[in-house]
Structure formats: C-alpha cells, structure tokens
Swiss-Prot record:
It comes from Picosynechococcus sp. (strain ATCC 27264 / PCC 7002 / PR-6) (Agmenellum quadruplicatum). Chlorophyll a binds at residues 672, 680. This is Photosystem I P700 chlorophyll a apoprotein A1. The lineage of its organism: Bacteria, Bacillati, Cyanobacteriota, Cyanophyceae, Oscillatoriophycideae. One of its GO terms (biological process) is photosynthesis. [4Fe-4S] cluster binds at residues 562, 571. GO terms for molecular function: 4 iron, 4 sulfur cluster binding; chlorophyll binding; electron transfer activity; magnesium ion binding; oxidoreductase activity.
C-alpha cells in the first residue's frame, strides 16, 4: 500500500507560535479576566475543540506524539548525564554490595551539603532509588564515558523527534486513511517495533551484556573488561561462550542446542547478583522476537492474504449477544478517544503487573537487595498504572459524549451494555457494599476482640484461621510444576512461590512469601477498593450521555458543574466529575496496596542472614499478628515506621523530613478547594478588588474566582500531589534507613 501524505498542508507560522490561544477565537483576543489563563491550559491540547476535521485532529495527535518522545529523550538524556557526571557508578560497579548508588550531588548554597550522605567508596551524594545503576550494569555499561555518549545520543534523538513532529504536520502530513489503516499499523507495530525491537535487544544482550556481566560476576574489575567492539572477535567470545567458536554453523544445520551456553532455561535467580539469569533474559527476548515477527504477518494489507480486523470483529457473535461486535471497528478507527480508552486500560493493567514482576522476578543485578529501590519501583509502577486506568475511564466517557453515534450501534455489544447499565451498575454497587462491609467487618471484629482481651476469638493464624487456600494452592503448583514441565531448570519461575532463600552478601534478595489470615483480610480490602474505583468510572461512562436525573446530559458536554439553575441536586454528575471522584478512590486503593507491600516485604522477606542460617527480618515477622487489626496498621506500620522520617532532622535524610511536612501541608491546602464553594471566593475577591480600587491600583485583567470545575481540578491535583509527596518521604526515609 502506498503511503499517502499531503505536501505542505499547514504553513509554519512563527507569529502563531508567539500568540497564546491562537487556536481559539475567544482566547486569541487575549485576557480580559483571570479565567483566560485557565481556559488556555484546559483547551491547548483539546484538539477536538479546535477543529472538527478528523484528519487534522489525527495529524495534531500524531505530531504531539513526537513532541512527547522528544521530552522523554531529553529526560532520559539527563538521567544518563547525571550517571556520567555526578555519580559513583564506576566505584559501585566494583563493589555493588557495599557501596550505595548515588547520582546527585547537592550544592551547599544554604547548608544543603548535609544531604550529601556518605554512600561508601569515599563518595558523598544523595542515594538514588530509580534502579538505573542496576539497569546500566545489566546493559553492559562499564564506565562513565559510555554514559556520556548515550546521554548525547539521547539529545540527538530528541532533536530528531522535534523535527519529525514539525515535518509530519507542516511538510508531509499523513492522510486520514493512513491513520485508519489498522492492519498495516498492527503488522508494523508487531513485526517492526516489538519483533525487531526485541531482536535488536537480544543482539545487544548476547554480544555486549552477557560477556560484560559474566566477567563482572567473576570478579574482573570494570576497567579491565574489554570494550564492546572487542567482543566482535569470535575468539574472545569463545573463551566465555564456547559455541561462538562454531559460528553460524549450528544455526543453519538446526543444531540449535549448541547455543545453550548463552541461551539458557535455568529459572530462578543468579546467586551472585540476585537477579534473573541474563542468559535466560536473552533467550526470552529471542523467543518474543520470533513470536512477534510472525504475529506481524497476521493481518491483510496489500497482499490479499491474512486477517481483516473488521471481518474478525463482525464474525464474532454468540447466541445471546445480538449483533456482537458489529460497528466496533468503525468506532475504533474514527474515535481516537475510544482507541485511547482501551489502550490505557490495557497498558495501566500491564503496568501494575510489571510492578509485581519487578520484585518477584528482579531483572537487574543487585537490585533485589536494594530495598529502597524495590519499594520505589513497586510504588511507582502501581501509581502510574492507576493513573492510566483512570485515564481509560476519562477517555471512555469523552468518547461517549463526543464520538458515540447511537444510530450506528443498534443491538451490538456496546449498545447492549448501555441498555443493561442499570442492572450492571446496581449489581456492581451491591458487590461493593458486600465487599466493604465484610472485609472491613473482619477488622472491626478483630479490633473489638483485641480491645476486650479475647485473642482466642479473633480471626488470626493462631485462633479462627482464614487461610487463603486458593492462593496457597497456586503458589504450590508454581513451585512444583517446573519439576515436570521443565525438568532441566534449576529453579521455578520465582522464589516468591516457594523454593530456597536467595541471599547476596548475607542480605535477603528473595525468598518464599508465605500467605496467611492477615493477607486474606487485606486482599479483600483491595478487592473492595478496586471495585469501588471501577464502579465510579464505569457509572461515569455508562451514564455520560443521559440519566434519569439529567436526561440531556450529552448536550451539556463532558464537564459541567450542575444542570443549571432550578435543578438542585444535579451537581457532580458530568463525565468529568466521575473521573474526579474516581481519582480519589484510585489513590485510596493503591495507598493500601503499597502499604501492604511495604510492610509484608519488611516483615516476611527483607532482612539479614544470621550465622546459624536463619533469617532476621526487618520487622521480625510482625505482619501476620499486627496487620489483622486497624490499630495494628496505625501503631505498627504507620506510626512505628514513620520514626525515621520524623527523626530525620540533622541527618542526610532531613530533606525527607521537610517533604513529609510539606506533603501534609499541600494535602491540607487541597481541602480548601474541595470543601468550599465558588460563591465564597467570588465574594472575597470582590471585596479585595474594592480595596484595590480605593487605592487606585485597579488590575487591568479582572480577577475571577475559579469555576466550580476548575476548583475541583486544583483540589484533586493538590490532594494527590500532597499524598504522593508524603508517601514518598515516608517510604524513602524508612527504606534508606533499613536498607
């Protein structure tokens, strides 16, 4: 299929670049009131509101993607530059179990020098928990010069992306049919991006990472390791991996087993580094590459063979599903909001899956014994996943309001879900009530029994047991199965299911995670909070066009404060408001998830190996006995573990002590926006303006109180920011102290 582009569709205008709000007639006139700056930010990237031409909207989104990639490359470049210029990476490489990673040095302008703690090896700096040192070692970086070069490469890529964004909007812009060619896009993304991308990474792992890491593991100093290009010599590689002496002969004679010295299937963790075997990782990426290159030949493009997505979707109907998926292909090729909603839901869920793999199958050398990094990466991926999933709810509702055409969706699955929305939402609501009362009820019972001195009547591992038998069964199966399915493997996929304790330098990297009554109870709190988040987002989506309360909701748009005067009790019903409320429950859910993870790991996994071979855990296994009451969570988790952040003043961790307070302050500040009405502020502003007029200081731009929606947006933003900063400080001060 020929690539279709329009040449020079939009002239490059520096005049427009210099004019804020050029995309909107009202905004382009400049500010009359302070509302202008808020509307400018709200609408700058709302391409739907700037034009109704789907082709132009598609081009703007496409161009913005390149802008986004440019920002990512600049950000990554900065990370690598810090690693090259301000870090102890080379010292850490040679003594990774003793020296701590640092890639930031504070200038002592007003005495911040105290923050540069001693991280070992004669280096003073801020200890980082991004895990980049571990990633760099796995990739085969052996000196800071290589990091410099990569940082420069990142800037070159950023410049290229900025150019591409400009070029594909102003010089050669793709036609709409190019954006709508789903089959070609899928083939390209599967084969080229995922397939060839994985194959390229496999090549790097085999030719650079494996030899470098094998030498580092065996104790060779980083400065004595050959440079990457020296490994192109097969005789040098053959010293480490004998099959290299045979070249490509085993490949073409189908004697692939010969390559099993660097493409392995060991399972478990490398006992030197506490990470997945790098040769397993290379093998995995090779397999992924083969799978995706084949998958990228599935769809029918210019050759008349393969699948058509439209045909697959329309053929997919069961006996009870009416028209099935008919009409969904058109939705996904004409509504980018619908497409984005599906992708965000999937990517968000996948990101939370990644959070769990980072600790259960740690991919990078020495990462598993850096408890601060493990906690940071779990928290980071969990929260990012949560934001993406709420974004799915947001764009799903925007699709319903702006792009959904009921006439084109008669009796298909989407129409049937919308027509069943009362049954769906009322049942989901019942599930939420059931989960909430029962899960919380178990804690209320336990607190009451403990308060009354009746431990024998509590739900606990030593009284009335509520063992998670299904989870224990899954753990058991995963521990035993490899013995039958992969008899040559050394260990199972992950030690969290069962197996031996893996320790690096007398520090636990990973060990079996035993589950009991405490886990069963908090698991059902997770189930409750996640279901409530889904309830809010799904209700917002299903009722975004109409409801019994506001039948013409679709006409009011995605975000509106209330259904006008004389309609009391119609506030917070817009699609936007459901996203606003969903964010609080997302934060609520994930706070309990990361608290559960943090305490469980400190209690049952992280710790040191004593001379007699037993494990001394950080909090001595108190999770099973303390996490079964609300009082236990407050006393033995929040209060006991916040001692490090509260007592951090005067130490290298003191910034976290200040951030802990600042985060609480920002959180409290958010309540000022969430608990007060617009009228209060407008009244206050008018009295302040009167005072200015009295002094002949009248402002040229008229002050206006934030709109109701803007106030809620500022409120939820500061609520989340305050909560995230507080948690960040609490977790980091704690984990860096125990780490």
């Amino acid at each position: 299929m020929a690539v279709k582009v329009d040449k020079d569709p939009v002239p490059t205008s520096f005049e427009k670049w210099g004019k804020p709000g050029h995309f909107d007639r009202t905004l382009a006139r400049g500010p009359k009131t302070t509302t202008w700056i808020w509307n400018l930010h709200a609408d700058a990237h709302d391409f739907d509101s700037q034009t109704s031409d789907l082709e132009d909207i598609s081009r703007k989104i496409f161009s913005a993607h390149f802008g986004h990639l440019a920002v990512v490359f600049v950000w990554l470049s900065g990370m690598y530059f810090h690693g090259a210029k301000f870090s102890n990476y080379e010292a850490w490489l040679n003594n990774p179990t003793v020296i701590k990673p640092s890639a930031q040095v504070v200038w002592p302008v007003v005495g911040q020098g105290i923050l540069n703690g001693d991280v070992g090896g004669g280096f003073s700096g801020i200890q980082i928990t991004s895990g980049l040192f571990y990633l760099w070692r796995a990739a085969g970086f052996t000196n800071s010069y290589q990091l410099y070069v990569t940082a420069i490469g990142g800037l070159v890529m950023a410049a290229l992306m900025v150019f591409a964004g400009w070029f594909h909007y102003h010089k050669a812009a793709p036609k709409l049919e190019w954006f709508q060619n789903a089959e070609a896009m899928m083939n390209h993304h599967l084969s080229v991006l995922l397939g060839c991308g994985s194959l390229g990474w496999t090549g790097h792992l085999i030719h650079v990472s494996l030899p470098v890491n094998k030498l580092l593991d065996s104790g060779v100093a980083a400065k004595d390791i050959p440079l990457p290009h020296e490994f192109f010599d097969a005789s040098v590689m053959a010293e480490l991996y004998p099959s290299f002496a045979q070249g490509l002969k085993p490949f073409f004679t189908l004697d692939w087993a010969a390559y099993s010295d660097f493409l392995t299937f060991k399972g478990g963790l490398n006992p030197t580094t506490g990470s997945l075997w790098l040769s397993d990782v290379a093998h995995h990426h090779l397999a992924i590459a083969v799978l995706f290159i084949i998958a990228g030949h599935m769809y029918r493009t210019g050759f008349g063979i393969g699948h058509s997505m439209k045909e697959i979707l329309e053929a997919h109907k069961g006996p009870f599903t009416g028209e099935g998926h008919k009409g969904l292909y058109e939705i996904l090729t004409t509504s980018w909001h619908a497409q984005l909603a599906v992708n965000l839901a999937l990517l968000g869920s996948l990101t939370i899956v990644i959070a769990h793999h980072m600790y259960s199958m740690p991919p990078y050398p020495y990462m598993a014994t850096d408890y601060g990094t493990q906690l940071s990466l779990f928290t980071h991926h969990t929260w990012i996943g949560g934001f993406l999933i709420v974004g799915a709810g947001a764009h799903g509702a925007i699709f319903m309001v702006r792009d959904y055409d009921p006439a084109k969706n008669v009796n298909n699955l989407l129409d049937r879900v919308i027509r069943h929305r009362d049954a769906i939402i009322s049942h989901l609501n019942w599930v939420c009530i059931f989960l909430g009362f029962h899960s919380f009820g178990l804690y209320i019972h336990n607190d009451t029994m403990r308060a009354l001195g009746r431990p024998q009547d509590m739900f606990s591992d030593s009284a009335i047991q509520l063992q998670p038998i299904f989870a224990q069964w899954i753990q058991n199966i995963h521990t035993l199965a490899p013995g039958g399915t992969a008899p040559n493997a050394i260990a199972s996929a992950s030690q969290v299911f069962g197996g031996d304790v893996v320790a690096i330098g007398n520090k636990v990297a990973l060990m079996p995670i035993t589950l009991g009554t405490a886990d069963f109870m908090v698991h059902h709190i997770h189930a409750f909070t996640i279901h409530v988040t889904v309830l809010i987002l799904l209700k917002g989506l299903l009722y975004s066009r109409s409801s019994r309360l506001v039948p013409d909701k679709g006409q009011l748009g995605f975000r509106f404060p209330c259904d006008g005067p004389g309609r009391g009790g119609t506030c917070q019903v817009s699609g936007w408001d459901h996203v606003f409320l969903g964010l609080f429950w997302m934060y609520n859910s994930l706070s309990i998830v990361i608290f559960h993870f943090s305490w469980k790991m400190q209690s049952d996994v992280w710790g040191t190996i004593l001379p007699d071979g037993s494990v001394s855990h950080v909090t001595g296994g108190n999770f099973a006995t303390s996490a079964i009451t609300i009082n236990g969570w407050l006393r033995d988790f929040l209060w006991a573990q916040s001692s490090q952040v509260i007592n951090s003043y005067g130490s290298a961790l003191s910034a976290y002590g200040i951030m802990f307070l600042a985060g609480h302050f920002v959180f409290a500040f958010s309540l000022m926006f969430l608990f007060s009405g617009r009228g209060y502020w407008q009244e206050l502003i008018e009295s302040i303006v009167w005072a200015h007029n009295k002094l002949k200081l009248a402002p040229a731009i008229q002050p206006r109180a934030l709109s109701i929606v803007q106030g809620r947006a500022v409120g939820v933003a500061h609520y989340l920011l305050g909560g995230i900063v507080t948690t960040w400080a609490f977790f980091l001060a704690r984990s860096l102290s125990i780490g």
